[in-house]
Amino acid sequence: MIEKVYCSEVKPELEGKKVKLAGWVYSNMKVGKKIFLWIRDSTGIVQTVIAKNVVGEEVFEKAKKLGRESSVIVEGIVKADERAPGGAEVRVEKLEVIQAVSEFPIPENPEQASPELLLDYRHLHIRTPKASAIMKVKETLIMAAREWLLKDGWHEVFPPILVTGAVEGGATLFKLKYFDKYAYLSQSAQLYLEAAIFGLEKVWSLTPSFRAEKSRTRRHLTEFWHLELEAAWMDLWDIMKVEEELVSYMVQRTLELRKKEIEMFRDDLTTLKNTEPPFPRISYDEAIDILQSKGINVQWGDDLGADEERVLTEEFDRPFFVYGYPKQIKAFYMKEDPNDPRKVLAADMLAPEGYGEIIGGSQREDDYEKLLNRILEEGMDPKDYEWYLDLRKYGSVPHSGFGLGVERLVAWVLKLDHIRWASLFPRTPARLYP
């Protein structure tokens, strides 16, 4: 029986062995009485050689007409050849065409196409080598996170997506009809994770989050994957240590397992190798001083947007923290700084090279009255948060947590020019199809 192999398994060590390959045509070139048919699958690309005197006139003519992305099965003998990808090729003896494609809508080099064309044909674009590489890196980052979290004693939980209230501001909620009332798509699992810490202490989840923001920047999506952690008995400094250790492990493990894919996007891996903790830490006050010294028009109390964060990242060659933000620009659930009531115990992790915030975290307010007052100050209805307030009535403890935007991390690791390429089917204010 002929052994079916993947493209990545075709190596010089298989010299003389008969194999079967199933995949899609990546490129097709006729040279005299031979056709060089490059076939790809999920693992790589293999050069196959179809000779007219071996397969016959009919099969040769059929092979000559195969366009990119035609699906085929070939059988043949492995031959070592240092000019071929992987150092070996397959001399074809049998070709089965599953479906012939005459013209594929995406150019052979997708970078020659407009972003809009690639997004219109996203269902086809994701099969191209670089798009596939992005998804492999993304899955590996998540796998690495799971490894680290399991080893460090964190429990994975599965919070709801349909919710009754806002976590990050009511203006960015997607509202939908829920039988005889209204519900919203979750902006964050945080509040539910906070409930889970009283039984499990250290919890995490990976869920989609939704933000109805009409932001048209290179780092915003309306739907994204959110890796969130919450822990009892931790203060802000404790949770920052967790963040840097987790991100460091995710990046280093992915470098170990997906170096080939990362090198499709990065010539220099120095910045990624520079993720050993501890990461630098600067206060919000120091950040304002740095920005003002560079001529940026920003005042104490202003939020740090993409432009300000980009300038700050020029000061660092690795991820870093900005901590101690003004209360007025942060969420209601963040704990007030006991040493300065103008501030909250919050920290953002920013990625270098202009990528900015990838994690937002804080110590949570654990006092019932203070949390209730913050909800009222924000103009929200305490009834929507009755259950959340209950957590401060029955054995409340100091606790902290954070959320990591998975696509933002992927975008930085691969130096992508836009976060949308880190999403399988990106959702933006202008894009809901396909």
Swiss-Prot record:
Enzyme nomenclature, EC number: 6.1.1.22
EC category name: ligase
Gene Ontology terms, MF aspect: asparagine-tRNA ligase activity; ATP binding; nucleic acid binding
GO biological process, one term: asparaginyl-tRNA aminoacylation
Main location: cytoplasm
UniProt keyword Ion transport present: no
Record localization: Cytoplasm
InterPro entries on file: Aa-tRNA-synt_II, aa-tRNA-synth_II, aa-tRNA-synth_II/BPL/LPL, Asn-tRNA-ligase, Asp/Asn-tRNA-synth_IIb, NA-bd_OB-fold, NA-bd_OB_tRNA
Domain of life the protein comes from: Archaea
Keyword Ligase listed: yes
SUPFAM superfamilies, sorted: Class II aaRS and biotin synthetases, Nucleic acid-binding proteins
Catalyses which reaction(s): tRNA(Asn) + L-asparagine + ATP = L-asparaginyl-tRNA(Asn) + AMP + diphosphate + H(+)
Pfam families (UniProt xref): tRNA-synt_2, tRNA_anti-codon
Protein family according to the UniProt entry: Belongs to the class-II aminoacyl-tRNA synthetase family.
Protein name stated in the entry: Asparagine--tRNA ligase
